[in-house]
């Protein structure tokens, strides 16, 4: 079986059988069966996912990570390998990440059998990237306590970069993701007796207006930030004063100071709305993933590997504004570096973005990823 046949077979199987975060049971079974057939030892620190290891009898241990979960999206691709699970789809390319790491494991096992594996390698098949913080769960579970990992590498498909390109950036490459929720409680009344009620409808309109101005008036316009209002509602009937109101959204920033500014302004909004409209207004925050920070000291190894794999380095001037739980590896485990491999191919129609119902790509890019990983492994530690 050629490598293209290998990645096509495994990626399309995974694509047909997507599973949501923390429910990747069949995906895990598929991966571990592959590892067993290959003769590679692994551990299962969590209910789903797996950590595999090959000992190269080296002083250096490096890790490579792939996320394995899917999204609650109905697939609209008209292909024979479309999702067989209703309203679940690999719309973020994790089927590709998993397959590329499987190919890399296969290559490393061949080197191991020949006695030419240059370093000790940890392969992370991580669950729950989309929701659940699988990276953090693995770290907290002690999954890596027995491995003196010096560096962690990961990659993500990117439909906005062309095939053969690898997008990199030192320091921040993805943003933090923090969810916020406003809860409003007033007093209902008939619309004919409106003065007897405390309307959360008007109060919520004020909240929406004020939250919408945070980004414009309180954050540096030269930085990339998002204060997004995703869902809001108030009231239950057309002829009653709304007794409850609700707003939820997300904050994306790569500067902790900017995040604090947003939180402070939202608390002020809640306080002012309570006073102005005589309702109870409270805002709560749910911390998501911190910014992904790429270690500058790994930059030389990354750039050398990209070039050695005959791929093109694309420097990104500003971070992406989506969240990524790969950030926990760099924050808690070891210096880390996260890159993006281009999958855009206009001739084949592979142009739609991540988290869309038409995401697709040519499996040959997964070989590019394995090539990049192999070059990182071969040249890691060189000056």
Swiss-Prot record:
Keyword DNA-binding: no
UniProt keywords, alphabetically: Hydrolase
Main EC class the enzyme belongs to: hydrolase
Claim: Hydrolase is one of the keywords in the record: yes
Enzyme Commission number: 3.-.-.-
Record-linked Pfam families: M20_dimer (PF07687), Peptidase_M20 (PF01546)
Cited InterPro entries: Amidohydrolase, Bact_exopeptidase_dim_dom, Peptidase_M20, Peptidase_M20_dimer
Disulfide bonds: none
GO molecular-function terms, A-Z: hydrolase activity
Homology family: Belongs to the peptidase M20 family.
Name by which UniProt lists this protein: Uncharacterized hydrolase SH1513
Organism from which the protein derives: Staphylococcus haemolyticus (strain JCSC1435)
